[in-house]
A protein has these predicted regions:
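A short SAM/SAH-binding and catalytic strip from SAM-dependent methyltransferases
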Residues: 105-119
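A short glycine-rich, Lys/Arg-flanked "PGG" loop and its adjoining helix->strand segment in the class I
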Residues: 122-134
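A C-terminal cap/extension of S-adenosyl-L-methionine-dependent methyltransferases
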Residues: 205-264
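A short acidic, Gly/Pro-enriched loop at the edge of an enzyme's catalytic core
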Residues: 96-106
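Class I SAM-dependent methyltransferase SAM/SAH-binding core
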Residues: 49-94
Length: 264
């Protein structure tokens, strides 16, 4: 399954389970805490528009793009698209349509963990920072190395043919070494620190948005409203702990672009 097939199948409008809802509520809490509160905002991995519409309703001037045209068409077909400044189709690391320092905030949720090489990830960072104003906020979602390793481990354990299982375990060894599994890359906190030093970013937070909870999905769906609200509250309260952020499935990196001086 390539990325176009994957996102066609798992499009946001089809993802309404409580686990995804909990992740969205964590993301909302983090954006409310760290985004500037107003200004020009670029959502360069907008999916079908969930975050773009919410932020436009909060008063941001939002430009929304995605690399899958079906997603862009879904955004444009939504009546709320009238609240967006612009929509477009392009990858999050191809922002040549925008001038330098055009936005007060740039968010990219879902693209970084598909950039499987360091060079690709650095292009995404450089382009995002090019269009971001000094002191602006840059946010991207990540998947952790542990998520890559656990995902392939469970794949191996669910394989019942001897030869296939041996291949799966050898793939697991490579995933553990490279942090790459199929179309996904797991970014370490150390790489985030290196990127921040290299490109003049002040890290505001690194937070878990989605724990390693695949096998809990049915349990969470069956929760009472009271238990579910307690679960979400716990997710929000714990999300910025460094250990939780290191061992999550998905997380959110949020940083501020430094205003460079003569010594930088």
């Amino acid at each position: 399954m390539d990325m176009f097939e994957y996102y066609g199948y798992f499009a946001e409008e089809n993802r309404s389970d409580k686990l995804i809802e909990a992740e969205n509520r964590v993301i909302d809490a983090l954006f409310d805490r760290y985004l500037p509160g107003s200004g020009d905002l670029l959502d360069s991995s907008a999916g079908t528009g969930r975050n773009a519409f919410r932020l436009a309703n909060l008063g941001y001037t939002v430009t929304a793009g995605d690399f899958i045209m079906d997603h862009v068409e879904t955004i444009r077909a939504n009546p709320e698209s009238a609240k967006l400044k612009e929509t477009y189709c392009s990858s999050a690391h191809r922002l040549s349509a925008f001038g330098n320092e055009s936005f007060d905030a740039v968010i990219s949720l879902g693209s970084m963990y598909h950039m499987r090489t360091k060079a690709e990830r650095e292009v995404l960072v450089k382009e995002s920072l090019r269009v971001l104003r000094p002191n602006g906020i840059f946010a991207f979602s990540y998947m952790s190395p542990m998520a890559m390793t656990f995902g392939q481990y469970f794949n191996a354990m669910r394989t019942y043919k001897t030869q296939d299982r041996m291949k799966a375990y050898r793939k697991l060894a490579n995933v553990e070494k490279t942090h790459v599994c199929d179309m996904f890359h797991g970014m370490s906190l150390e790489e985030m620190t290196d990127i921040s030093r290299e490109y003049g970013l002040k890290i505001l937070t690194v937070a878990s948005t989605y724990g390693l909870l695949y096998d809990m999905a049915d349990e969470i769906e069956a929760m009472s409203e009271e238990d579910y609200e307690a679960f979400v509250k716990c997710q929000i309260n714990c999300c910025e702990d460094p250990v939780v952020a290191r061992y999550c499935m998905r997380g959110l990196f949020i940083a501020q672009k430094k205003e460079l001086d003569l010594f930088d």
